[in-house]
């Protein structure tokens, strides 16, 4: 019933107006029920001070630099909103997270480039010493090949093996020049075990080139660059031994002067 109704009598007009008022009150109640729950402004969650709505408002830029910063903030804001939206809905995918990560990596790359541009001249002025490990990593080809500057310690180490080889050759020549002596000993060999002990001992002796053991005759013949007394003393530590024949000891040459 729209507008006001005017009836012929005042009583009928009052009845119609009262019915119209009742109809309006019922329709407003039904509209409130159909519109959903009313927001409770007295809810403590809504009144919580930690709930900030600063992200919902974006300030307009005042200059070009502020405009770039606001664009970055807008992208970050969009990424955050997309992440929170996906978390709330439970959907998969990381489009917002990927965009945010890409933005962060771009900022890090720009920071590194700016730092390298600033620090490169100072690094170029610093010269690394020759003995350091960074010297080999330089761009100078002479430093890599080592043709200009050589480490004296390395040259000494390279020359050392050559000197050792010379000493070894000298020892071999001296050993070859000396006369090999043959010594015959009589050793108390009671069993094959005693023979094995003497054989092992002679094999370990220095200067012995060859030896022969006659178990039946208890005779041991040793050949090498070693004196008879040294062989006798060495074998006597294992078994009782003595010379088979008295060794001929060379007598010193004594010049007789005529009176």
From Swiss-Prot:
Keywords: Metal-binding. CDD domains: HMA. One of its GO terms (molecular function) is metal ion binding. Pfam families: HMA. InterPro entries: HMA_dom (IPR006121), HMA_dom_sf (IPR036163), NAKR1-3 (IPR044526), NAKR2/3 (IPR016578). Residues 180-246 form the HMA domain. The keyword Metal-binding applies. PANTHER family: OS08G0405700 PROTEIN, PROTEIN SODIUM POTASSIUM ROOT DEFECTIVE 2. This is Protein SODIUM POTASSIUM ROOT DEFECTIVE 2.
